Design a protein with these regions (language model features):
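Catalytic His-Asp segment of secreted/periplasmic serine-dependent ester chemistry enzymes
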Residues: 162-247
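Conserved SGNH/GDSL esterase-like catalytic core that processes O-acyl groups on lipids
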Residues: 40-136
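C-terminal motif of bacterial Sec signal peptides marking the signal peptidase cleavage site
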Residues: 14-17
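Generic structural signal for well-ordered alpha-helices
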Residues: 138-143, 186
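Positively charged n-region of N-terminal signal peptides that target proteins for export
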Residues: 1-7
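A short helix->loop->beta-strand "cap" motif at the edges of active sites that frequently abuts
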Residues: 149-153
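N-terminal, intrinsically disordered, polar/charged segments of Gram-positive cell-envelope systems
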Residues: 20-47, 58-59
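Second-shell loop/turn segments in exported
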Residues: 89-93, 104, 122-132, 142-145, ...
């Protein structure tokens, strides 16, 4: 991402009132069909860790090896929530299929790059608790990665927007307000990246329509999971950013 956009993202001030979601459990995994893989080369070296929208990189088959990709780390549920326990989570280790701790996976794999994407799960709680809680949870995870795999290049990816059609019946806020919360969380995530000298990539802006919602063509039926085309756009944005940093 161009440096100017990074600066603009991190300096935008968003003021939103705190609301409470009726059910703040992680958004569930849904089955998505396989599609054509992306040919982005830099992303071939990345391990992806995050929520169900990250797991769907595998479900959509957009990474090399399609649904058999070993580039996505996730628990059996297919989703994680960024909280104080995330660093102690168990994942299904793709190389063996066994369930091991994230710490063990980092030590075994020593990934060249690890891309983190968090924010939608628990978004309203993060806003209600304030930036210190969100940053604490993210920093804890970053510290674990640095400790267990010090040579890994850590990428913090922005959380993705939701579509206007998303069912908001479990929330006490509108889709527009939830997107404003996501924007705020992305600013906080950017600040974590800056503090630690990490790469922050604003993929969210590549998915938004003129009103800030997830574009229709990038939205699955539920309004928050993504289409294969959306993932190709995301992977291209990541690839382009990494390529620009190499040049």
């Amino acid at each position: 991402m161009p440096k100017l956009l990074l600066i603009l993202l991190c300096t935008v001030l968003l003021f939103t009132s705190c609301s409470t979601r009726k059910d703040d459990a992680p958004i569930s995994l849904t089955v998505i069909e396989e599609n054509q893989a992306s040919d982005a080369s830099y992303t071939d070296d990345i391990i992806f860790l995050g929520e169900s929208t990250t797991y769907h990189l595998k479900s959509r088959g957009v990474l090399p090896e399609g649904k058999d990709t070993k580039q996505v780390w996730a628990p059996k549920s297919g989703t994680l929530m960024l909280d104080p326990t995330v660093k102690d989570c168990m994942i299904v280790y793709p190389e063996t299929g066994e369930e091991i701790s994230l710490s063990d996976a980092l030590t075994r794999k020593n990934p060249k790059m690890l891309c983190l994407t968090f924010g939608l799960n628990g978004a309203t709680s993060f806003i209600a608790r304030g930036d210190s809680y969100f940053k604490y949870c993210y920093q804890d995870l970053v510290d674990l990665i640095k400790e267990k795999s010090p040579n890994t290049k850590i990428i913090i990816n922005s959380c993705f927007p939701i579509a206007n059609k998303m069912d908001m019946s479990r929330y006490t806020i509108t889709a527009e307000v939830l997107n404003s919360y996501i924007d705020t969380l992305n600013i906080w995530a950017c600040s974590i990246a800056e503090k630690n000298g990490l790469i922050f990539i604003d993929t969210a802006s590549t998915l938004k329509d003129k009103d800030g919602y997830l574009m229709t063509e990038y939205s699955a039926d539920d309004g928050y999971h993504l289409t294969a085309e959306a993932y190709r756009v995301i992977l291209k944005a990541i690839n382009d950013t990494l390529q620009n940093k190499e040049n």
